[in-house]
Regions:
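A conserved SF2-helicase RecA2
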Residues: 302-307, 523, 531-569
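Conserved interdomain linker/interface between the two RecA-like ATPase lobes of SF2 helicase motors
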Residues: 281-282, 288-292, 298-378
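Conserved helicase motor
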Residues: 190-195, 212-224, 240-246, 368-369, ...
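Flexible beta-alpha connector loops of hexameric P-loop NTPases
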Residues: 212-220, 262-272, 335-341, 424-428, ...
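Accessory, non-ATPase domains that flank or precede helicase/AAA+ motor cores in DNA-metabolism machines
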Residues: 1-294, 306-322, 559
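Cys/His-rich short segments
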Residues: 348, 357-443
Length: 572
């Protein structure tokens, strides 16, 4: 102290036994800052849970429970105490609440020095279900893919192109088992929180407490605990949405991106990154394979696979030789000619009723939230718009509000024009809430669940609604694009698309690609059990090449035609 000229302070406590951001993530932040033209601090901040970010006002309490620790074998005063001690010996660190003996008995044993009741930290588990499941036998095609990827001992990107129901998840699970047996870890990503419960259930059933979950719907405490479990090397697998790509795993042996084509993998706020790009950087760092899986790969990924940049693996058939669903296009122009102005065509209404009568389930896709798309004044032709985003406000009947789907600005619904004061206004368009109401009014035996952002806002909302549908508490699932990917319900034999033209006509050069992906994915939800699946797609343009490719399940033809269009227009 005299030499340095200042006083040393005593270290009271070490805050973190291990740094929250390891050397790899710090190197990754440098790379991201350069690639995205962002500051390094913003890149580092997006890697941390919100509870650990500077200026965060949220506090997280550490959870404890009392457990019984066995110390030594000594003769006790009563047979009851001896019986309790023997039980405690067989159940190390038994929680007091789970002990079949009274607290009086335990306190007497503790006074004699045979046991000690201590406080132990416990982690909050976001998913409590504990269903154990063994590996399923792989088909020859699945086994070929697994063997091919396991032979890779260096960085390589694999594009796993498998039709819906071809068993890609089983490939992920068995690859993960082999990687864990080598003493390495696995990073598994899905594009949306909606898909997390099903993927978590699959991984938890095989690997139990070795799995951690990371996504934004976890509570502050759960997310904090899961992050600490990863930092402390207590887990071997991390399953999560886009942000899970920054999980502080060590010794990564495999990185998987399911539904790699999904737009949700792109971070729209600063720093703007592509999850696949970050995953490939981490794959290079750890010298491990990166698997990009999809039934409808992005054109960029498929093009790279054909050029040899990625390694292409294919699963062209469903497991157990199950046929793909038959798809029928319903021309809504013909429906109008026959004076049917309903939301559903006559054919689709008949098919829904037949499916319900057979005690089978239905899934209906309408990629539009709310009840009505907008409100128009019939006197002055004014449309009510968001003052911040300049887009029309959507009517939500359940909350009786007009809401902006970009910034969530909302005002109470008043049937009056804000511009001229006229009450001669009309709600135009249809959303999931309107379809839900229509089904309940027109099908007497319909038990409907609506599955969109609005119905799943609360914690565990996704899990609860999907569990109810899986348990057949409802027989119709109506939803937005959230129902299109990754869901596996064996009793669903009919899928209906209310309006295929919604995404086909948006002003985006990727409109064709996204429409094909959405329709092919949602079609794949049908017929995943023992019964043949059927799909009906309502459209005003049934001869469009995208819809014809969907009808024939022909990805190669779609790829060929769409690439020709992009090359002519000089699109990416």
């Amino acid at each position: 102290e005299e030499e340095k000229g200042f006083r040393y302070s005593f270290i009271i406590q070490i805050i973190d036994q291990k740094p929250l951001l390891n050397k790899e993530l710090q190197e990754l932040a440098k790379y991201m800052a350069k690639q995205t033209l962002s500051t390094r601090i913003s890149c580092l901040q997006c890697m941390l849970p919100i509870q650990l970010k500077p200026k965060s006002q949220k506090t997280v309490g550490i959870k404890y429970e009392k457990v019984i620790s066995f110390i030594k074998e000594i003769p006790l005063k009563t047979p009851k105490q001896q019986e309790a001690l023997n039980y405690i010996k067989e159940h190390p660190l038994l929680p007091v609440k789970d002990c079949p003996y009274s607290l009086v008995v335990l306190n007497n044993i503790e006074k004699q020095g045979a046991i000690q009741i201590i406080q132990q930290e416990v982690y909050r588990d976001p998913y409590h279900e504990n269903i154990q499941q063994n590996d399923f036998p792989l088909t020859p095609m699945q086994q070929k893919v697994v063997n091919e990827i396991l032979l890779c001992h260096d960085f390589q990107t694999y594009l796993l192109h498998g039709v819906t129901g071809s068993g890609k998840t089983e490939v992920y699970l068995q690859l993960s088992r082999h990687i864990i047996e080598q003493g390495k870890t696995v990073l598994m990503m899905v594009p949306e929180i909606a898909l997390t419960p099903m993927m978590v259930a699959a991984f938890k059933s095989r690997f139990g407490k070795q799995v951690a979950i990371l996504h934004s719907k976890l509570s502050s405490g759960e997310r904090y605990d899961e992050y600490r479990r990863i930092v402390e090397d207590e887990v071997k697998i991390v399953v999560g949405a886009r942000s899970a790509v920054f999980a502080p795993l060590e010794k990564i042996g495999l990185i998987i991106m399911d539904e790699e084509h999904d737009a949700s993998y792109k971070q729209e706020s600063n720093p703007r990154y592509l999850t696949s790009q970050i995953a490939r950087w981490r794959g290079k760092y750890h010298e491990c394979p990166v698997v990009l899986g999809s039934a409808t790969p992005s054109l960029e990924s498929y093009s790279r696979a054909l050029k040899g940049v990625y390694h292409l693996c294919s699963l062209p058939k469903r497991i157990n030789q199950k046929p793909l669903p038959t798809i029928e296009m319903i021309d809504m122009v013909e429906e109008i000619k026959h004076h049917n102005y309903d939301l559903l065509s006559n054919k689709m209404k008949t098919k829904i009723q037949e499916t319900l009568d057979k005690n089978e389930q239905v899934m209906l896709l309408l990629n539009k939230r709310g009840y009505a798309s907008y409100m128009r004044c019939l006197s002055c032709d004014e449309v009510l718009k968001c003052p911040h985003c300049d887009v029309s406000l959507t009517y939500h009947k359940d909350s009786k509000t007009m809401r902006c789907h970009y910034c969530d600005y909302q005002i109470p619904f008043i049937k009056k024009c804000s511009h001229c004061g006229s009450t001669n206004v009309k709600l135009i368009g249809s959303g999931t809430q309107k379809i839900e109401e229509y089904l309940e009014n027109n099908f007497l035996n319909a038990r409907v669940i609506r599955y969109d952002v609005d119905s799943t806002r609360k914690k565990d909302g996704h899990h609860e609604l999907l569990k109810r549908f899986e348990n057949q508490e409802a027989n119709i699932l109506v939803g937005t694009q959230m129902i299109a990917k990754g869901l596996n319900f064996e009793n669903v034999t009919f899928v209906g698309v209310i309006n295929a033209d919604l995404s086909l006509n948006i002003p985006d050069f990727r409109a064709n690609e996204r429409t094909y992906q959405l329709l092919e994915q949602v079609s794949g939800r049908s017929g995943r059990g023992k019964k043949q699946g059927t799909v009906m797609i309502q459209t005003y343009n049934p001869d469009h090449f995208v819809l014809q490719c969907v009808k024939n399940h022909d990805y190669q033809m779609f790829y060929k035609k769409e690439m020709e269009i992009r090359q002519l227009a000089k699109y990416p």
